[in-house]
């Protein structure tokens, strides 16, 4: 999903933003992203924390229950709603691959009918405020617990 940035936009005193990096090794591209909050808006801060927490919750379900990509995103949607957010399916996860990602697999993680393999898929969680005021994003590769701090 590529969108042009609006010219002249600057972070304000009470903003939420994300960094999205795509490190490359030869022709292969990874992906990682996280939201940050400037200021002290409690809703924005909770949204950013919840996006990362939901990522790890879904990743844990992937490890324990060996669910398909479809089932993982259905679970993420239920959990997001229980937390008071909407899950944005415009960012449905993707295969790690050469760029563009569709060169190896044309579908998204949310559409995958089998269990995604470790180190091959990016799980994307994008939460939105139900009133559309802000959102938060967290994404990383599906990896086991050894790759994350306890």
Functional labels for PLM-detected ranges:
Residues 1-150:
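Active-site neighborhoods and metal-handling regions in enzymes and metal-associated proteins
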């Amino acid at each position: 999903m590529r969108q042009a940035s609006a010219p002249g936009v600057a972070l304000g005193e009470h903003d939420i933003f994300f960094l999205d990096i795509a490190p490359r090794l030869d022709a292969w591209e990874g992906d990682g992203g996280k939201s940050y909050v400037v200021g002290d808006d409690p809703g924005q801060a909770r949204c950013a924390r919840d996006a990362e927490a939901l990522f790890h919750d879904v990743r844990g379900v992937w490890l324990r229950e060996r669910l398909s990509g479809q089932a993982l995103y259905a679970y993420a949607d239920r959990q997001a709603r229980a937390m008071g957010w909407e899950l944005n399916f415009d960012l449905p996860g993707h295969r790690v691959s050469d760029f563009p990602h569709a060169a190896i697999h044309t579908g998204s993680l949310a559409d995958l009918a089998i269990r995604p393999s470790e180190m091959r898929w990016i799980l994307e969680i994008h939460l939105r405020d139900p009133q559309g005021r802000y959102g938060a994003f967290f994404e990383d590769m599906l990896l086991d617990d050894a790759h994350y701090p306890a």
